[in-house]
């Protein structure tokens, strides 16, 4: 049984708030919709310079850290099939082909997290990780958007570690939820 975005928001919001408080960076939850990802929950950083929630409600998955985390859960064949018409054009051209995307997703799978280096928006970087359902499939992505001025290698590592831990907590919460919390 699939969980609705509303149910996912209710189940995952406490951990989303906890990781936002820990990092004081903007954090978001994403779902895959075809070749796009959609933001269905987020909490903004309280810093003066911060990434805004819903800056992109829907974006090509290969352009966001959360989207790449979701794409990395698929096989290369699935990625090829879903992008049979090619990659949607976007104003940043860091990844320009399916072959380049597959190479990038290989790195994401190795590291356990995805990055976005100003690929969705100039001045914005991010880290994204997969959140797994009780059956082990990837359900949603958890990401943090960070102004590029704060996105040092050390900060990227710190954010990745916090998101990986939070995603594990979220997965455990999903595995332990009461069946009555499932929508439809």
Tell where the protein language model's regions lie, with residue ranges.
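Cysteine/selenocysteine-centered motifs that mediate thiol-based redox chemistry or coordinate metal-sulfur cofactors
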Residues: 81-83, 164-184
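Conserved acidic, metal-coordinating active-site core of Asp-based
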Residues: 90
């Amino acid at each position: 049984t699939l969980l609705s975005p509303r149910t996912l928001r209710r189940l995952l919001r406490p951990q989303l708030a906890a990781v936002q408080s820990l990092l004081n960076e903007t954090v978001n939850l994403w779902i895959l919709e075809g070749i796009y990802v959609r933001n269905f929950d987020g909490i903004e950083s309280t810093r003066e310079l911060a990434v805004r929630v819903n800056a992109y409600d829907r974006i090509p998955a290969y352009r966001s850290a959360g989207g790449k985390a979701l794409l990395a859960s698929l096989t290369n064949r699935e990625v090829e099939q879903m992008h049979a018409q090619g990659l949607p054009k976007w104003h940043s051209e860091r990844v320009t082909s399916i072959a380049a995307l597959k190479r990038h997703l290989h790195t994401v799978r190795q590291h356990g997290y995805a990055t976005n280096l100003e690929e969705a928006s100039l001045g914005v970087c991010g880290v994204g990780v997969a959140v797994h359902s009780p059956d082990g499939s990837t359900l949603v992505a958890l990401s943090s958007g960070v102004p590029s001025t704060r996105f040092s290698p050390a900060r990227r590592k710190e954010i990745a570690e916090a998101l990986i831990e939070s995603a594990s907590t979220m997965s455990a919460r999903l595995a332990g939820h009461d069946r009555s919390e499932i929508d439809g």
